[in-house]
Amino acid sequence: MFSGIVEATAQVVAIEHDRDNIHFTLRCPFASELHIDQSIAHNGVCLTVVRREADTYVVTAMNETLRRSNLGGLQVGDEVNVERSMLMNGRLDGHIVQGHVDDTAECTSVEEDGGSYIFTFRHNYSPELARRGYFTVDKGSVTVNGVSLTVCNPTAETFQVCIIPYTYEHTNFHAIGVGTKVNIEYDILGKYISRLQELS
């Protein structure tokens, strides 16, 4: 379980393909504190640490993860937003994030707004996806590349988020431009409500 408050960015230093799996080696400030079997969110995707050295660690993404996320497009040198799992004795500063990415979305616009930034994203839409809770609501929560954000101006297939300078500079949002594919996780509460309505 995560909160969507990104701790740092990690740099991809090696990529190894193993049949349908990809092993990613990453370097980040807290790598030396990690241990095997620990869960880390990478651009919002929960992955397990399988190997660790002094300042790097390795995680494996399987086919299902690669199909639903942007991890398969990573290259050596890319920045990835990372967050360790949430401590249950602390404040929930973001929102409840599972690290189970639902789909990807494409950035269609980046606008400067008096020192902050407004990003517009287009995501897959169908009535079936909406029935499963894959939609956004105004002032609801959404996770973009692992960052907990508030939705603005949603339509059936687009939404906007407002990014303050700190978030822009300390996450990989500064590398997102028109055409960039990002990972999105819809609000778990909306998915549960949609499922309950479907079963009632």
Where are these regions (language model features)?
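Conserved loop->alpha-helix
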Residues: 1-200
